[in-house]
């Protein structure tokens, strides 16, 4: 009887809600200035109970459901691509000797077939989230594997991958399946039911924080002065701006200053009704540009999908109302939402106001605590000082997007046998699948610990590991980031204490960047320069390649002593002095001043210059023959210039072969550049089709292995070969080079010295 009585009261509540729909779902009834501007009155937040009532106000679920669908779709597309399902066998091949970088050392990947199962669960969770099918379960099925894979590899961390995990976490708790969902079709109580306002507030707050904190981080002096993304203005997307601005001013005004202003203002522009159309234009243009400028996967499209969250929640119904009637039958409902137990409704004066329950209070507390935590985390680096390097914290949760750009000039890994004292050198990055360990003390410690476990297999006992890593950040001098005299295996490191073997960034030398740019611009096209800064008491050992026939070193600041190893000669340089360095030999540069030294290498690759001259001569000769100005016969070894390589014909010289390969490359680039849009679209779709095809086939193979056991190695090899086929590519289309950073067979340690060469 009690169960049957409940539905009997529902229609009366439903009728009341429909009558007061405008008042309950669109904000305050009174058209006060604050109500029109913010959507609520000051009295709505004047007490805890009123705040609970506000955040649990019934709201149209339509806009939330559209975001749920689009976000789920983006994750379905993201898993085979940026999450790495298509290349999972290269990263987690069973028996692969590789150093990994999880957040916690206890986190380790499962066997390969089980990793495919984890990814399958994540994919099905994203699909269920998109469709609103078993919604809560689907969100959990996506969320748990996603964070497991995310925490498994710090080298792949970035801001947008972190954001995906946060959005999925929020969607797990909100009622995004109350509209346009399979759950709504199966359960009448969920179909087209109100959602509380906090569902929108927490998502809007998250997106607002992403924009605004990113803008605050861009107030960094390097960004404001235009050093962070200095070379971005060379991209063709900025060509319209360069019609009226120089490349330098385009970089400063458009890339840096406009990027700063957009991030600071985007959240506000989207929040207020009057400015929202302007915000939509700028934000959409910004993310469309980013999709072409950077390889950041689904991030621009996720941010585009999040923008309508700031619109009136019923915007999808208004859009459906403008569609043809026949099409409306296939689209989401237009009818008014039904009541939901998740919301608090205003009642008549006689009955009094609805009292907030425990559920409503907990949801309000969750919203406030979550947003406060998100405001705190980007500035929590004073707690996790072990992750602070030249930039604060692990790259990923600080929203300091694109603020810091790095270049690495020199990386040397030295090992010492703890028993014999024998020295040796390792190829930088051996036993790894990433290069990001170079900039982070925590990853360097993990790498050194891993090497100390692996090197005994190569007859190196009790190994000591030393790293000499030179980095330039935002066009500063190349300088050491870690102390090369410290054995990192035994070095102390804690996530909550400052890393003692981290070298400071020489901020006092930042004003030199203007002078360095002037020096670069004064050099001709064939002359290169590298700017170095080093600490007192340290030295740089370097090797000048035989190709660099004209190399010199010039001191800019401090005092150094240059040792020519082969000649056993030393020469001390004062500020402004320079000396020639012999090619094909080692030298050492000692900083003997009490302050850091600054110097530069100036060099010309004479071999490359000679090659360019020879290739230019062959190009000129080919053009003369083709236009008839060259009447004499070509020597047999130069005939391929006109006819290409012919089987059975004369063997072209290495120079001619190089010329022909370059011509072929240039022709291919020109062909692709001038290809019609439909051809480029087909090529793009075929690449994506291969990624999804390989992901599907490799997943099927692994799930079969788990269910029925692994077949013979011969059969597995045939199946993987079939998965690697590109059957849909047009004939003659070259397969793209595998740019996957993972290497299933990393090289063994090299016992020969490895030094940087210019």
From Swiss-Prot:
Nucleotidyltransferase listed as a keyword: no
Family matches, as SMART domains: HTTM
Entry superkingdom: Eukaryota
UniProt membrane topology term: Multi-pass membrane protein
EC number: 4.1.1.90
Cysteines paired by S-S bonds: 99-450
Gene Ontology cellular-component terms listed: endoplasmic reticulum membrane
Gene Ontology MF, one: gamma-glutamyl carboxylase activity
UniProt biased composition (Basic and acidic residues): 12-22, 749-758
Transmembrane segments: 61-81, 114-134, 137-157, 293-313, 364-384
Residue ranges annotated as Lumenal topological domain: 82-113, 158-292, 385-758
GO biological process assignments: vitamin K metabolic process
Tagged with keyword Membrane: yes
Disordered: region residues: 1-34, 727-758
InterPro entries on file: HTTM-like, HTTM_dom, RmlC_Cupin_sf, VKG_COase, VKGC_lumenal_dom
Main location: endoplasmic reticulum
Residue intervals on the Cytoplasmic side: 2-60, 135-136, 314-363
Catalysed reactions listed for this entry: 4-carboxy-L-glutamyl-[protein] + 2,3-epoxyphylloquinone + H2O + H(+) = phylloquinol + L-glutamyl-[protein] + CO2 + O2
PTM-bearing positions, type N-acetylalanine: 2
Post-translational modification: The N-terminus is blocked.
Keyword annotations of the record: Acetylation, Disulfide bond, Endoplasmic reticulum, Lyase, Membrane, Transmembrane, Transmembrane helix
Further remark: The vitamin K-dependent protein substrates of carboxylase have usually a propeptide that binds to a high-affinity site on the carboxylase. CO(2), O(2) and reduced vitamin K are cosubstrates.
Oligomer status and interactors: Monomer. May interact with CALU.
Role noted for this protein: Mediates the vitamin K-dependent carboxylation of glutamate residues to calcium-binding gamma-carboxyglutamate (Gla) residues with the concomitant conversion of the reduced hydroquinone form of vitamin K to vitamin K epoxide. Catalyzes gamma-carboxylation of various proteins, such as blood coagulation factors (F2, F7, F9 and F10), osteocalcin (BGLAP) or matrix Gla protein (MGP).
The protein's name in its UniProt record: Vitamin K-dependent gamma-carboxylase
Provenance organism: Bos taurus (Bovine)
Primary gene name: GGCX
């Amino acid at each position: 009887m009690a169960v049957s009585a409940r539905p009997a009261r529902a229609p009366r509540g439903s009728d009341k809600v429909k009558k007061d729909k405008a008042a309950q779902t669109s904000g305050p009834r009174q058209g006060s200035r604050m109500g029109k501007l913010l959507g609520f009155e000051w009295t709505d937040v004047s007490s805890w109970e009123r705040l609970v009532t506000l955040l649990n106000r019934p709201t149209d679920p339509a806009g939330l459901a559209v975001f749920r669908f689009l976000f789920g779709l983006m994750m379905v597309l993201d898993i085979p691509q940026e999450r790495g399902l298509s290349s999972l066998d290269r990263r987690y091949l069973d028996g692969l000797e590789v150093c990994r970088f999880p957040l916690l050392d206890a986190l380790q990947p499962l066997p390969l077939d089980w990793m495919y199962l984890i990814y399958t669960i994540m994919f099905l969770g994203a699909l269920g989230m998109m469709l609103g099918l078993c919604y809560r379960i689907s969100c959990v099925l996506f969320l748990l594997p996603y964070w497991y894979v995310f925490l498994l590899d710090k080298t792949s961390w970035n801001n947008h991958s972190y954001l995906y995990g946060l959005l999925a976490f929020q969607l797990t708790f909100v009622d995004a399946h109350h509209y346009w969902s399979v759950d709504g079709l199966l359960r009448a109580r969920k179909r087209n039911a109100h959602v509380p306002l906090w569902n929108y507030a927490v998502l809007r707050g998250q997106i607002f924080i992403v924009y605004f904190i990113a803008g605050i981080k861009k107030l960094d002096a390097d960004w404001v002065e235009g050093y962070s993304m200095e070379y971005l203005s060379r991209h063709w997307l900025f060509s319209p701006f360069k019609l009226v601005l120089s490349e330098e001013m385009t970089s400063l005004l458009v890339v840096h200053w406009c990027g700063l202003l957009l991030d600071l203002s985007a959240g506000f522009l989207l929040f207020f009704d009057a400015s929202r159309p302007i915000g939509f234009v700028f934000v959409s243009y910004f993310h469309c540009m980013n999709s072409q400028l950077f390889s950041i996967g689904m991030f621009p499209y996720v941010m585009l999908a999040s923008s309508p969250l700031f619109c009136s929640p019923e915007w999808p119904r208004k859009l459906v109302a403008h569609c043809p009637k026949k099409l409306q039958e296939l689209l989401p409902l237009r009818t008014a939402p039904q009541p939901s137990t998740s919301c608090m409704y205003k009642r008549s004066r006689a009955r009094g106001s609805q009292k907030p329950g425990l559920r409503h209070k907990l949801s309000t507390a969750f919203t406030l605590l979550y947003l406060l935590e998100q405001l705190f985390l980007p500035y929590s680096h004073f707690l996790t000082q072990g992750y602070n390097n030249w930039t604060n914290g692990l790259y990923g949760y600080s929203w300091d997007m694109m603020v810091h750009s790095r270049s690495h000039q020199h990386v040397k890994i030295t090992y010492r046998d703890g028993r014999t004292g024998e020295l040796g050198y390792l190829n930088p990055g051996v036993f790894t699948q990433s290069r990001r360990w170079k900039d982070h003390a925590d990853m360097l410690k993990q790498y050194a610990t891993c090497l100390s476990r692996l090197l005994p297999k190569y007859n190196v006992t009790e190994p000591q590991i030393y790293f000499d890593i030179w980095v330039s950040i935002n066009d500063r001098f190349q300088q050491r980031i870690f102390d090369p005299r410290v054995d990192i295996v035994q070095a102390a490191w804690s996530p909550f204490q400052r890393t003692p073997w981290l070298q400071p960034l020489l901020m006092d030398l930042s004003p030199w960047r203007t002078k360095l740019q002037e020096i670069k611009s004064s050099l001709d096209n064939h002359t290169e320069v590298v700017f170095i800064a080093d600490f007192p008491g340290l030295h740089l050992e370097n090797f000048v390649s035989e190709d660099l026939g004209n190399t010199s070193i010039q001191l800019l600041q401090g005092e150094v002593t240059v040792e020519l190893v082969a000649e056993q000669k030393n020469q001390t340089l004062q500020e402004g002095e320079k000396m020639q360095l012999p090619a094909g030999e080692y030298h050492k540069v000692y900083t003997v001043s009490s302050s850091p030294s600054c110097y530069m290498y100036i060099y010309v690759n004479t071999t490359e210059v000679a090659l360019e001259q020879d290739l230019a001569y062959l190009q000129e000769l080919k053009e003369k023959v083709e236009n008839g100005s060259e009447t004499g016969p070509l020597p047999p070894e130069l005939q391929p210039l006109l006819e290409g390589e012919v089987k059975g014909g004369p063997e072209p010289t290495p120079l001619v072969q190089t010329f022909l390969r370059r011509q072929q490359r240039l022709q291919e680039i020109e062909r692709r550049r001038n290809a019609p849009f439909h051809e480029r679209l087909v090529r793009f779709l075929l690449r994506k089709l291969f990624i999804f095809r390989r992901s599907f086939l490799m997943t099927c193979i692994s799930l079969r292995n788990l269910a029925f056991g692994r077949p013979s190695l011969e059969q597995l090899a045939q199946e993987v070969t079939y998965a690697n086929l590109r059957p849909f590519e047009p004939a003659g289309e070259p397969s793209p080079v595998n740019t996957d950073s993972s290497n299933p067979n990393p090289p063994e340690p090299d016992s020969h010295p490895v030094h940087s060469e210019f």
